[in-house]
Amino acid sequence: ICEFVLEKKGHFTLASGRNISSMRKPFQSLPITSTPAVLLNGAGIYDYEHEKMLRFHPIDPAGYELVRAVTKKFPAVEVEILTNDSAYTINAHMFANIMLRADNLPHRKFKRIDEVPPENWGKVIFLGMPPLVSAVKQDLLSIKDPNVNFMSSSISSFELLDKGIHKGVGVVDISVLSGSERSPT
């Protein structure tokens, strides 16, 4: 990376499902701080050099309704909702609390979905024991044209993003923001 970025003047970034706080250390350990990072699996583009969110793709309100339906149908599921700069949890127990510690973000815990501010959600993670998450995943994937993107991140988590959002979109966003004439590789 050092040779590519420093000697050849190339551009390199990291694309991750992580948030601003949990991505900071790995990102800043590389010589790439002048290039923004892709966060929240493409929902956010963050500039660590200027400490500024450059682009954020919040989940459509249809996504909120899906989360509401999941928490009603699967009351044991834990939910972590990541915004551009904070986290909310619903029904936080073992899995969501571990995520909150790892994320190291300002956060608020809620018992019910109706208590959660419904704006600025970048990524929703459904968490729990593998059989529960598998049932949630199966239920969500059975929806025709859900107007959101789903991503399987582990056997104990399943993620929801705005429709059309993924890490590749974030890389293209960086290319557009930087005025790059070449397509990202």
List PLM regions with ranges.
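Active-site phosphate-binding/coordination module
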Residues: 1-96
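Conserved acidic, metal-coordinating active-site core of Asp-based
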Residues: 76-185
